[in-house]
Amino acid sequence: MVHPVQVGKRTRMSFAKVKDVAEMPNLIEIQLDSYKWFLDAGLYEVFDDINPISNFTGNLVLEFVGYTLDMDNIKYSVEECKERDTTYAAPLKVAVRLQNKETGEIKEQEVFMGDFPLMTEQGTFIINGAERVIVSQLVRSPGVYYNYNVDKTGKKLFSATVIPNRGAWLEYETDSNDVIYVRIDKTRKLPISILGRAMGFGSDQELLEYFGEEERFKATIEKDNTKTKEEALLEIYKRLRPGEPPTVDSAISLIDSLFFDAKRYDLSRVGRYKFNKKLAIGLRIANQIAAEDIVDKLTGEVLVAKGEKISRANAEEIQNRGINSVDVLVEDRVIRIIGNHFVDIHKCVDFDISDLNIRELVHYPTLREILDNYSDEETIKEEIKKNMTRLIPKHIIKDDIFATISYQIGLAYNIGYVDDIDHLGNRRLRSVGELLQNQFRIGLSRMERVVKERMTIQDQEAITPQQLINIRPVAAAIKEFFGSSQLSQFMDQTNPLSELTHKRRLSALGPGGLSRERAGFEVRDVHHSHYGRMCPIETPEGPNIGLINSLATYAKVNEYGFIETPYRVVDKSEGRVTGEIRYFTADEEDQYLVAQANEPLDENGCFIDKKVTVRDKGEVLVVPSKDVDLMDVSPRQLVSVATAMIPFLENDDASRALMGSNMQRQAVPLLKPYAPIVGTGIEYKAAVDSGVLPKAKNAGEVVYVSANEVRVKRELDGGVDTYRLLKFKRSNQGTCINQRPIVAKGDWVLKGEVLADGPSTDLGEIALGKNIRMGFITWEGYNYEDAMLISEELVREDVFTSIHIEEYECEARDTKLGPEEITRDIPNVSEDALKDIDERGIIRIGAEVRSGDILVGKVTPKGETELTAEERLLRAIFGEKAREVRDTSLRVPHGEAGIIVDVKVFTRENGDDLSPGVNELVRCYIAQKRKISVGDKMAGRHGNKGVISRVLPEEDMPFLPDGRPLQICLNPLGVPSRMNIGQVLEVHLGWAASALGWHIATPVFDGATETDIEDCLEKAGYNRNGKTVLRDGRTGEEFDNEVTVGIMYILKLAHLVDDKIHARSTGPYSLVTQQPLGGKAQFGGQRFGEMEVWALEAYGAAHTLQEILTVKSDDVVGRVKTYEAIVKGENIPEPGVPESFKVLIKELQALCLDVKVLNDNNQEVKFKELAEDDDEIEVLEVNMEGTEDSTTEEAKEEKGEAYIPAEEIDEEIDYENIDLLDFTSDLDIEDDFN
């Protein structure tokens, strides 16, 4: 039943029936751990890969010995970096050793390799002052993938792809004549036997002896026109390098460099792991019938007798004894299975080698060689260490290639299985660390080329490592990655949840991933392996659906980049669920039967029911309880954080739940945050891990609290930790970040405890919206189409008021005509317009500004015209003062207004880093307090979104029997067809809880039942059906039926009407078509498109239509005349010819078509050009001819005139009577064109 739970500083009444057995991991550890790995091991691996760099003669050798990140020399703190637009980074210093083999001289030096961006504690990077997140990328894992197509006759044709991390691909395919072909690196296909010959089996006999007498292979050999190893090599060389003279030596070196050179071909640890998993002989021969006795060559022991079934244990032993080729019987045929000769080293060595920390399988022939040559433990250990790259090769080896061919042959006989590339066992994550490592590797390899060049050019005696190394390519690669990679994204900082979700996002797009256009339906679909790893709900709507996902709540990423999810282990002998929790990757989990988290258990942890519902891959089965292997740790383990914050998620339709989880990320932080009365219990964890709350670094006593800082006296050493709070800072999205202390002086705090609330948090819990008293009732049609009717109380009491801060900057640059100047002395500006400007020319803090007001006064020198003698004389007498300047001040843009909350000034004199050519930079911050208004978008947590249609006086709202009016009325029709019933349950439970004074936790898939809610309603003294008699606020009469009334948690979304409303006066025009630009940012017009024209045509509104297509759009002369007529109060003149029509004619003429416009009398119409009407326009001082450049808003604004951009007059060319001599005069045209 319902029981109290302590969440931070608040007690919630929880309806959860399942006890939490596993702690949820830190929600941003995917970022933190990956970056930590990069600094600790990833960087070292890159340097290790590139070591040593030697010149072509080999007598100069450059080695990278070690590296340090100089954490003491970080220039600015995180906050300062944001303020100064710089990157939060530490200098990377690398110890380099240069060895001259001729002289034996060794020089060591520490080389500075550029500033390396650091991750903040919140898992973000500050790049050029902007907070960015590196999104993890989901890519196909390196490995071998088999699949099949069915041909016309219904025969399965198997194919395979061998995908390395980087290097040449191998692709196998079978045609309908059973010939197996190979493509090397996407070239033309060759019979596979050619590859076998080139790898060492020259004759047909050798091939058949090794791979076994199998029909398909024989057919392939018949198709093969080469007969020896040399011929095969030459054949491959011809295919790969057509047009070059083939020789055996060059063919051998080509194949070596393609596949067996670690610098050119890299499987990575993951690739090696997947290869061994797929190709190792153990799993492939298990459960097959042995065709011959399987004998250990070393001891002569028979492991499996002929005709016996090979058990799983036997198979593993056979593999670890180093037996690599086994014949099995399939339907009376003998099929040979060849493994890739990798074994578990711990089973082959009879002493303890755990200190070598080898976790992968090792290459048996290499290991055998070491064991045969040495006998004592220490030497063997030393040799194993020395030969690590041979034992665990990062590139492909011949044994791998033979094993892949053998697997391809075996598939036709149902030995082995084909792969599903959408399975999460075959897709892995590249997180920050690995993405950075790849970038760094690119930079280093570019640098390596430079080093090699410099080694040959420079004097070898006097050379130092510093002179050899050029750090530019490395710095550029890193900078490019952080600045412009598709995976480095501007952090979504609307609220703490959006920040947290962004850091946990998984994208299949980006370099090396998929592209939107190519991604088919399968990749985007939900897969059974997503369970507990990726959220099946949270993904964007639109073209990216299914390509961008979110990590599930309990998921972790393992060392190979595969996503793991935790399960409770079931002891099958007793049928008891143990306390052990193990993490499984998707392919490990596939062998087990998994019970749900809410399966009832007794107090000993045994299943109560005899039959248990379990998952087996994608199937749901009911099995006896003794067969269950694993059990989920929590009901919320399959969804992401945002989805887990929707109460009664199990009662919502999936597509509405998707909108609900996406819209929570768009909730604007409100002035006074309130946590939801009906929560799910994950709010506290989400807020604490999101990084917006200051947490105590050490336990201790709070000794000082103010709005700006909290000081805690440490328990350990008595020192004091000071925590500065952020006050009214602007987030990336323009919302307001403000932290408020929630501890008092004298409080004792523990390590990790929350000290202050941030944006959208209440007592450390995420609080995205407000608990609102609402009813499902229609009201005079104001609920039509999901609209919402709200009470004036919400406006008056600032319930949905939010603060938005915009940043505007103005820079004074050096121009060709002289420097720009920030000053109060602006030409043609009244004193009234300067009333809030200080003597520097910058607005004062606290001033209230409206659109068009000056923020920063700035003047720019005007172009000097040729001076007359008199002017020169005056200039000589009175000095420079007479210089012409124009006003280029920074003004508040259209539709913006507010109060100046902060001004920052950066100048060269103060030693601030400014970009080249900039002398001074001023930033102004304008804050707006936005109350809720008609047109704002609001939503619940169940995907129930709507726009406010009317703000009704409080006294007119429907009211309850006790006289309280409703605050919001929602349309009851929004529920049944959308199937998001969760909102109704939330309303009922919230109604009861608010009366009882409770805050509630009802976790997803394990929340309050209908009976629970009815009991709560009864306890609160309400009707069990949750309905109430309502009266009309205007008449006081009761409504006909009872109405569902209750408390719903409602969010205000970041789609505010103030940002969207827009009206154009005279503004900029497109250069070619002379039509107004589009969009609010360009101060554009509304497009009157094709369909709108049809509508007017249908009504026969000819004059309206003509007006819209001419004077209101691109009739350049006509619009000037119309403006003039309106100003003078005259009738509007006849429209002229639209500019776009002229453009069309010019385009046709450009295609050498003789196009003329004729009138009724078949006479040619000459178009009137703007130039002819110059004099008329001048009188008006207005120019209706626009340019696309909307930045030259000048002094016209002050006079209150419309801004009209600078004039453009094209010279008209008379194409008919053009003189060809004009074109030919400068050309020598010869007569002979042959």
UniProtKB/Swiss-Prot annotation:
Coiled coil: none annotated. Keywords: DNA-directed RNA polymerase, Nucleotidyltransferase, Transcription, Transferase. It is an enzyme of class 2 (transferase). It comes from the Bacteria. One of its GO terms (cellular component) is DNA-directed RNA polymerase complex. Its EC number is 2.7.7.6. It catalyses: RNA(n) + a ribonucleoside 5'-triphosphate = RNA(n+1) + diphosphate. SUPFAM superfamilies: beta and beta-prime subunits of DNA dependent RNA-polymerase (SSF64484). PROSITE patterns: RNA_POL_BETA. GO terms for biological process: DNA-templated transcription. Belongs to the RNA polymerase beta chain family. This is DNA-directed RNA polymerase subunit beta. It comes from Clostridium perfringens (strain SM101 / Type A). The lineage of its organism: Bacteria, Bacillati, Bacillota, Clostridia, Eubacteriales.
